[in-house]
Amino acid sequence: MNSPLHSAHYRIPYFCLKLLAFIGAQAFLTYSASAIPNAVGGFLAQAESPLNDTEIGDRLLDPELWAGQLELPGTWREEAPIASVKGSYLAARPKVMGLPAIMVQARHREGKLDSLAITFADAGSYFGYLNEKLPPGLSPRQQQAELQRRLAAKQQQFSSFFRKTETSLRDTLRELTEKRPRDNHIGKTRTLRAEVIDYQKGNLALRLLVGNQRLIRLLIQPVDSISREWLDTDRSAMSTSALSRVYEGRVTKPDNGDVLIGTLSIVPQGYKPYCGLNTLTMAARYFGLHLDEDWLAVAGKFQNTGSAAGSQLPRLYLAVAREAALDLHKSNDFSLNEARKSIDQGLPVVVWRRFSGTRNKAHSRQTLMAAKNPDYRIPRPDTAARDSWPDHKSPLHASVVVGYNPSRTEVLFVESWAGMKIPRRMRAEEMAATAYLTFYFKP
């Protein structure tokens, strides 16, 4: 199922297309234009709340809310932080400015509301995984024709929904705000630059982001806090040496000999083909970038197909590094020594590697055994163990290496899905043997 990347030299991590095939098929068949983004694992699709289908736009713009005199409406659930900024999302499906909101997210800085983000359209959650389940008895040509027919119909539906949503939101913002809107942008790099339109209502900036027929999002924050950078203002104000100290301070060394970055939060990919994007998002948020997988999909030129085919992922890694005032080394293999140098400085390493469900179970088992017994070591791989490792025919998948154990020759890594609260473990030899492409972040 591997499909060529835009560059002839690299292929996209495609295990993402198979991991949750059943969930993906259900999503394709049942989720509507207001399908739920992957960050909450589909929870909102079933969330029961008195705010469902209820207009809350006025409450989100209330000056008393931003002055700290009122609480946000509804029940909020925690999500991955960005630097020192805490993140949460509303456990409801309300309306905002007369339109159904796919997701409402909040950011709090030192206990005070810092910004809101309302997503109105997102192709990644609308298309989900490509549904390949077809009626029996079709010839290969008929199968291809049926898939194309289904996809074309879904693309037409989304295009119409996207166009109507954008037009309605622009009209509402124009009527709602007092001043003439201004063109602006977010991002220092050309790859991640987002063109936005800034509207103003009182002391609030209403920043409209429309991304290439994939994403419609409204950002709300005080006028005096808007920025043209993805990097959090606390981080962008730091010197290079101060930033280095922040990252180095995240490295822990428990008694079992691990060297570990302890504060990299998981951003679950849900039913989207986004393992390469979500692992990068996890690193980006750790660096203090206000990025998510949905904008990265726009910047990476993902198509509205329910697949990662044709996207341009590798260039996003360098852009993320540049936005975070870091450097990047891309390699066709995995070097434990080079990974150690990055991790020692508090910088994670993203690895595209060959994936096997059998080996994934083995990694989980090894991880749990090590958690129960601090003296446990993964055995040195013999010929039989090496023969069980996935080869070049196996699907690709992206993981984030966040630690290592030098005396045990083990690496610790996290995935873009839930299920284990501690980093997984494997022998460094296996990571090196199965790695396809490695991204080392550097100071």
Question: For each predicted feature, which ranges?
Answer:
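Solvent-exposed loop/turn segments at secondary-structure junctions
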Residues: G270-Y274, M282, K301-S307, F334-L336, ...
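Predominantly the structural core of cysteine protease catalytic domains
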Residues: A308-Y404
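N-terminal secretory signal peptides that target proteins for export/translocation
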Residues: M1-P13
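A cross-family detector of function-defining hotspots
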Residues: I36-G128, E146-R235
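Bacterial N-terminal signal peptides
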Residues: C16-A27
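Active-site-adjacent structural segments surrounding the nucleophilic cysteine of cysteine proteases
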Residues: A33-P37, G42-L44, E48-E78, I82, ...
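Noncatalytic regulatory segments and standalone regulatory/sensor domains
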Residues: L219-D224, R228-W230, S239-N256, P374-P443
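Extracytoplasmic
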Residues: G111-L113, G270, G346, S394-A398, ...
